[in-house]
Amino acid sequence: EPDYRVKQRCLNGHAPWPEGICTKCQPSAVTLQQQQFRMVDHIEFSTSNLINDFINFWRSTGYQRFGYLYGRYEPYPDVPLGIKAVVEAIYEPPQENQTDGLSLNLPWNEEESVDEGAAACGLFKVGMIYTDLMDAGQGKVICKRHIDSYFLSSQECCFSAAMQTKNPNVTKLSASGKFSSKFVTCVVTGNENGEVDVHAYQVSSTCEAMVAADIIEPSVEPSVMRVKESTLERYVPEVFYKYKNKYGVNVQESAKPCFPVEYLLLNVTHGFPLNQTPLFTSPKSFSIENRPGIEAQDLKTLQNHLDATKGDAHLVNVLSDFHLLTYIKSTGIFDKKDFDTLARIAVTHSEADAAALSENSGWQTFLAIMQENDNAPIRNQDVNFGATQTIPSVAVDDAIAEGSASSDARGGWSCRHCTYSNPRTAVNCEICVLPKD
């Protein structure tokens, strides 16, 4: 595993960096070349609706969009020892629209909750996806990324390297317990025919190490990566890259001050299965998160979504929606055991589990709260940033079990709607937000 940082514990008897350095603790020169292997060979989207729903935001607003790919890894038989990432869902974190792109604040508050919800479904982050679309009129989009411009900009390469470092590939065959990353980057942009297309990439392990060592930085020219200068706090080794000149001879040149980003890129193929069998099969999609002004995620929307539920078989179909599951988890009403039951119904489509859920006290309480709160959302979204606020993390079943006796002993009052025991000074119920009287 490449590492271009100065070793901090050198045994040669000199002062530690930056006061001293020797040939044993300083990193060796870097020679850039195309990486000969890929950690992931193919990206498979379980259904085309994933991409259509994702780019609908751009179609509606003209703004770009970012999302995380949740899925799993499977063998890819089309290449020897191949690995493919199967994408089952796209989650869109809070983001702020800009005229020239978008702004992210990562990690966001609910990232851990979303990851736990995905894990309950047997999924985890396998990559990220974002749009880079510009309308050309007549149903076409502008082709901005091609062989004469760039495929992935230097800034995007640094971002991908940081995300790959954050999501390493765990292996027992490495001394550090990890090696490179299977995290992929997908860009939805226009192709040479003016059609919307997906391009998938990874950056090399060399790029990951150079970004971690603070050796490179983005350039104003998107197709060029800049090598930083050495300072008292940062040691930058010699960086070279090789290419064939017009005579077909291999030539080695210094990469300072800059070099082409193609030396850091890896192409990854993508596609859709011939027989689409997605994990989530809800016939009607629930509202997508963090789309203020376009789609709302609140109790009223959820109640309307569940109102059509007729019997356990239909409940199985309605619950089989990743966005629905993550929203329900964000409310904090269900404990881990009950939410795991919801997730199991969503992915296994078991009518027996759905029948058991219908009789579950937690589910019945959840339905009762929704009926009493047609206009009182548990979760509110900020118009500018998509920030969320959730109800207090209190188990509803435990609150019901406390009863009115303990409430009277503390001088509080019990909500006549959900029976939660509130403090005496509370005007509205802390759980269902309804007034005391």
Which residue ranges define each predicted feature?
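Eukaryotic assembly scaffold/adaptor repeat-domain signature, activating on surface loops/turns
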Residues: 58-62, 70-75, 120-124, 137, ...
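Core residues of folded domains in eukaryotic genome-function proteins
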Residues: 18-21, 62-66, 77, 81-89, ...
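Short HxH-centered metal-ligating active-site micro-motif
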Residues: 1, 18, 92-150
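C-terminal functional modules of predominantly eukaryotic multidomain proteins
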Residues: 1-12, 16-38, 108, 144-168, ...
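Eukaryotic short linear interaction motifs
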Residues: 29-32, 75-79, 95-101, 126-127, ...
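Beta-strand elements of modular eukaryotic interaction domains
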Residues: 10-13, 54-60, 75-81, 90, ...
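Eukaryotic beta-rich interaction modules
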Residues: 2-5, 27-76, 82-113, 411-414
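Amphipathic alpha-helical scaffolding segments
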Residues: 65-67, 72, 83-89, 132-136, ...
